[in-house]
């Protein structure tokens, strides 16, 4: 299945670079819709200089907010299945495969996320410290953890809506009561 990932960003350039690199580590050809939401931290220049034929770039000079750009990203994405990520998220191995196996029409599939211990625990996440700042991420430890725990959590599901998520594009517009 072909999938597009939408990643809006507001003043998170260095986190966005980590997000982009984590996706490209596992998925070289997946379509990305990367959105600069009026950032003032040189995200615009980074996006302009990004050489990747599988990236649709939306470079807004005006801040419009994530919700606006979720919709715009959906409109620009060329694939039937679309995921939304925050610009400070990184993915582990098999992220796409593990979320797609639960995807059905009319459903939103949210992935379990790992957050540092400054955030409260919740059933939708694992609290672990792999670094907070874009400079101190322990990516090798994160990948090792994902690989070791993938079997333990492979059939664990929870109810709720939280990022990152994947759904059929038409379902997004149906939820929004939007005809595109």
Where are these regions (language model features)?
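N-proximal low-complexity "stem/linker" segments adjacent to membrane-targeting elements
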Residues: 1-22
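A conserved acidic beta->alpha catalytic loop
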Residues: 36-45, 62
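Glycine-rich, basic loop-to-helix element that forms the pyrophosphate-binding segment
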Residues: 60-77
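Conserved donor NDP-sugar-binding/catalytic core segment of glycosyltransferases
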Residues: 94-133
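Short aromatic/hydrophobic "clamp" motif used to bind/position activated sugar donors
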Residues: 82
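A recurrent flexible, glycine/aromatic-enriched loop bordering the glycosyltransferase active site
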Residues: 145-169
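The conserved acidic donor/metal-binding loop of glycosyltransferases
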Residues: 86-90
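Short, acidic, metal-binding catalytic loop of nucleotide-sugar glycosyltransferases
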Residues: 21-30
